[in-house]
Amino acid sequence: DVIEIMVQRLYARCGLTDETDFQMLGSKDYPTLSELYGLIEAEYKGFDSGERQLYTAELLQNILLGLHSMCRGPEAKFFNGHTNITDSSFVTFGVKGVLQASRNLRDALLFNTLSFMSNRLLTVGNTVAGLDEFYLFLSNLTAVEYVRNFMKRVRKKDSAVIIASQNLEDFNLDGVKEYTKPLFSIPTHQFLFNAGSIDARFYTDTLQLEESEYNLIRYTQRGVCLYKCGNERYNLMVNAPEHKAKLFGKAGGR
């Protein structure tokens, strides 16, 4: 609550109120975390214990200690400053560099990214979000819940979500499968290819396939897949046009 009060004061100093038309503002019209830290620090240094206050000096001190790293310390490079996204028509978030970071830092950055995606998918609309190597985020149940909510609601805003992962078993881990199982029943369009060495029963149960449907992709065939759309099923052969095949190259993805 104290942080909320301080943020309101900071916004008021910058001329931002409930009456402000935020659609007319750019990223640099907003204050940064270092400015928030400076405001709280000034409040702490000038604290008058002789007057009645909504908070104590000790509480302000604890807030400063908790925020220091992300406002002025080593984590400030991730959180303090204005966004460098000038055109959001095509944005790639490379998260490889933070996968080895502490869990708290990684989760905070992931929450920022998912919040941005949520706004584009569900508020702006007509947006496609692709999540590659999704197994890396399955340990964060908040992220899984975010994505599940995306997938349930994006169609209403003409948006779409694409999820890619290495192995289906990653979604079946204890403590996770209760959240991930709905992800396979939500998509309107599904392209299902041969599952490789995955157990057939597990594959059919997870993706809710009939035995006859599974038999169409039981054996490895390049480009052959089962396409599901509502109650319709098609056995497809997927071929890349020549002009797109050139974009893929011949180095096996390297």
For every predicted segment, state its role:
Residues 1-159, 163, 216, 220, ...:
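P-loop NTPase motor domains
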Residues 12, 17-24, 145, 177-180, ...:
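Short secondary-structure boundary/capping segments
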Residues 96-99, 135, 168-169, 197-198, ...:
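Short, glycine-/Ser/Thr-/acidic-enriched flexible segments
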Residues 141-142, 146-236:
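Conserved ATP-driven motor cores of ASCE-family P-loop NTPases powering translocation/secretion/packaging/pilus
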Residues 239-240, 249:
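Short, surface-exposed polybasic-aromatic patches that bind anionic ligands, especially phosphate groups
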Residues 250-254:
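Acidic, low-complexity intrinsically disordered tails
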